[in-house]
Regions:
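A broadly conserved detector of short glycine/acidic/proline-rich loop/turn motifs that flank catalytic sites
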Residues: 8-10, 25, 48, 58, ...
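Substrate-binding/catalytic subdomain of NAD(P)-dependent oxidoreductase enzymes
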Residues: 1-34, 39-41
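A short, polar/proline- and glycine-enriched secondary-structure boundary/capping micro-motif
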Residues: 32, 63-67
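Short acidic (Asp/Glu) and glycine-rich catalytic loops that position anionic groups and cofactors
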Residues: 45-52, 99-100
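Residue-level signal for pocket-adjacent positions within structured domains
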Residues: 27, 49, 175
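A conserved regulatory-domain signal marking ACT and ACT-like small-molecule sensing domains
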Residues: 67, 72-186
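Structured core elements
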Residues: 5-6, 20, 43, 53-55, ...
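Glycine-rich phosphate/pyrophosphate-binding beta-alpha loops
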Residues: 50-52, 56-63
């Protein structure tokens, strides 16, 4: 299963800065999925230390006071730090549409023949492969509806947005598709 988490993700790949914050699904076996309450967690991956996980208090009066005090100290010695810095390599910030990853999709549709093939056809056109699919009866008093849940293999976010735009305009779609990014730490 998965757990919903608000993650900030920063990576540097080929001189591009990847820096996003969004709610996503995380496998419930991952350490980061178990971080709750006043705690924050950080996963650091590098060529040298592989994967490290850090957890500590990040909310509440004492952690907040510590952060504020740290910011004041950093600000007060900023001028001295600026003089000691070497040149920083400039990296290009990446657009979220360039993200690659898995997705959870929930479609609300009329329950009729051809719905699943209509959805999968649009996914196929955009090079998106399904990992799993489940269909349940939907809730509607006017017509027979279905809820279709799909998880995908890794794909390009730009392709996913193009596919969802087309799918949401299909005549059997009852409401806009719900999508949540899935973050894999393997």
């Amino acid at each position: 299963g998965y757990k919903v988490k608000l993650l900030g993700i920063t990576q540097i790949r080929k001189k591009n800065l990847i820096n996003f914050v969004y709610p996503c699904l995380v496998d419930h076996n991952e350490l980061i999925s178990k971080v709750d309450g006043v705690f924050n967690g950080i996963i650091v991956e590098s060529d040298f230390c592989k994967k490290s996980f850090f957890q500590g208090e990040g909310a509440g009066s004492q952690p907040t006071a510590t952060s504020v005090l740290s910011d004041i100290i950093d600000f007060s010695i900023k001028e001295r730090k600026e003089k000691s810095k070497s040149k920083i390599n400039i990296v290009k910030n990446t657009n979220i549409l360039d993200r690659s990853g898995s997705f959870y999709l929930r479609f609300s549709t009329v329950d009729q023949p051809g719905v699943i093939s209509g959805i999968t056809n649009e996914l196929k056109k955009n090079n998106i492969s399904m990992k799993s699919m489940l269909q349940k009866d939907g809730i509607s008093k006017e017509k027979k509806c279905a809820t279709i849940v799909v998880t995908t293999h890794n794909c390009n976010e730009k392709d996913m947005m193009k596919a969802l735009k087309k799918i949401n305009n299909l005549n059997f779609v009852v409401k806009k598709t719900t999508f949540i990014r899935i973050e894999n730490f393997k």
